[in-house]
Every structure is written in C-alpha cells, then in structure tokens.
C-alpha cells in the first residue's frame, strides 16, 4: 500500500455537501488538493499523494468516502 503524509481518508464526509467536504479535506491535510466531481465523471487513474477526489451526486452530496487516490 502507498504511504502519504497526513490524514488520507474522510468517511465522516459521506452525506455532506461536496464543497464543504472539499474544504474540510484541504483543512485537515494541507498536502492535498480536493477536487469535487459528479458521479460517473472521467478521472485519471494515476496515484497521487496530493489529490483527493470528492465524488458527489446531482444534489452535490458526497456519495463515497473521499480518500487520497
């Protein structure tokens, strides 16, 4: 498994607003940039310690655990 500095998963953000979740991720781990994407959006598969996808539904609600990916 890959190791990245700081917190790497935010299960407590499922069901929250995507924008609020992204701000929380970036506040809790200053090494990452949180990117809000709608479910089904194309995303790269390369692993990066500085990126967290925040996946939301059509209502802007987080639907899966944001984590470094």
UniProtKB/Swiss-Prot annotation:
In vitro, strong inhibitor of bovine beta-trypsin, weak inhibitor of alpha-chymotrypsin, subtilisin BPN', subtilisin Carlsberg and cathepsin G. One of its GO terms (biological process) is response to wounding. Keywords: Acetylation, Disulfide bond, Protease inhibitor, Serine protease inhibitor. Signal peptide: none annotated. Disulfide bonds join 4-49. It comes from Linum usitatissimum. It comes from the Eukaryota. Belongs to the protease inhibitor I13 (potato type I serine protease inhibitor) family. The keyword Metal-binding does not apply. GO terms for molecular function: serine-type endopeptidase inhibitor activity. The record marks 45-46 as: Reactive bond. The lineage of its organism: Eukaryota, Viridiplantae, Streptophyta, Embryophyta, Tracheophyta. InterPro entries: Prot_inh_pot1, Prot_inh_pot1_sf. It holds the Pfam family potato_inhibit. The keyword Transmembrane helix does not apply. The modification N-acetylserine is found at residue 1. This is Proteinase inhibitor.
């Amino acid at each position: 498994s890959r190791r990245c500095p700081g917190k790497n998963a935010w299960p407590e953000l499922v069901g929250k607003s995507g924008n609020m979740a992204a701000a929380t991720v970036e506040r809790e781990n200053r090494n990452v940039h949180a990117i809000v994407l709608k479910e089904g959006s194309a995303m790269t598969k390369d692993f990066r310690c500085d990126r967290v996808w925040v996946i939301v539904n059509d209502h802007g609600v987080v639907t899966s655990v944001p984590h470094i990916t």
